[in-house]
Each structure stands twice: as structure tokens, then as C-alpha cells.
């Protein structure tokens, strides 16, 4: 779980190698979502200069607005199971967000968000 959370939310998800989607297979799906939410709920948020910070601010106002739009879209394309709003005041902070969807063609499942939003989908098998 730490590797998924770090990949999805480190650098506020602003890296090309960020995990944007996770697929849970069969009976592990519910446990996967529960564990992801638990781990993302305690990721340290803050200024990038603080050593304990795992999720800092987005790069600029355009990025902030884009990610907030995707968070709003996520409510129509899936179930938002975690949206951290305990972010520092001021700046372009967006907390980790975990969304579950059963729509593999949803925008939140197919577009590059480049922010701290992780989409989780279920698969019956490989």
C-alpha cells in the first residue's frame, strides 16, 4: 500500500510516473479500497520545504483549478470515497482524493489529471 500511495500522491501527483489508476481484481477489491483510503487519509500535507510533507501544493492556479474540476467530475463519474480537505491555508493545495468507478471509459479513468486524484476500478479477473 505505501508504494501505491506514494506513487499516486507524492509531488501532489504532478509527475509522469504517478499512479493515476489502480485495478483491484475480484475478492481483494473492497479490501484494496479500504486500505488505500486508510493510507491516503494520513499522508502528511504541507509546504514542500517541510521534511515530513508527502503532498505539497500544485504548481500554479491553472493546475489547481484543473484538479478541482476533476474532483467535481469524479462525483458524476464515480464515488468519491476520500477527498482530503485538511490542506494548509493559502497556496494551491489539493488533498489526496480516491475515487471508485465502474466506468472504464470515464474521463477520470482515461485522462491524465496530473494531480492527487487516484481512480480505483474493479476487474473480475485478468
Spell out what each predicted region is.
Residues 116:
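Glycine-rich nucleotide-phosphate-binding loops and adjacent flexible coil segments
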Residues 112-113:
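Short, surface-exposed loop/turn microsegments at beta-strand edges and helix-strand junctions
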Residues 1-103, 122-126:
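ALDH superfamily catalytic-core signature
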Residues 109:
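Short, solvent-exposed loop/beta-turn-alpha elements that line the ligand-binding surface or hinge
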Amino acid at each position: 500500500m505505501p508504494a501505491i500511495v506514494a506513487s499516486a500522491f507524492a509531488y501532489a501527483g504532478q509527475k509522469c510516473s504517478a499512479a493515476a489508476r489502480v485495478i483491484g481484481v475480484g475478492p481483494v477489491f473492497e479490501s484494496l479500497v479500504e486500505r488505500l483510503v486508510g493510507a491516503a487519509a494520513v499522508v502528511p500535507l504541507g509546504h514542500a520545504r517541510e521534511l515530513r510533507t508527502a503532498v505539497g501544493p500544485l504548481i500554479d492556479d491553472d493546475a489547481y483549478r484543473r484538479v478541482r474540476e476533476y474532483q467535481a467530475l469524479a462525483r458524476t463519474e464515480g464515488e468519491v470515497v476520500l477527498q482530503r480537505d485538511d490542506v494548509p491555508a493559502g497556496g494551491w493545495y489539493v488533498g489526496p482524493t480516491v475515487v471508485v468507478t465502474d466506468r472504464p471509459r470515464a474521463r477520470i479513468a482515461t485522462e491524465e489529471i496530473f494531480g492527487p486524484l487516484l481512480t480505483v476500478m474493479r476487474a473480475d479477473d485478468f
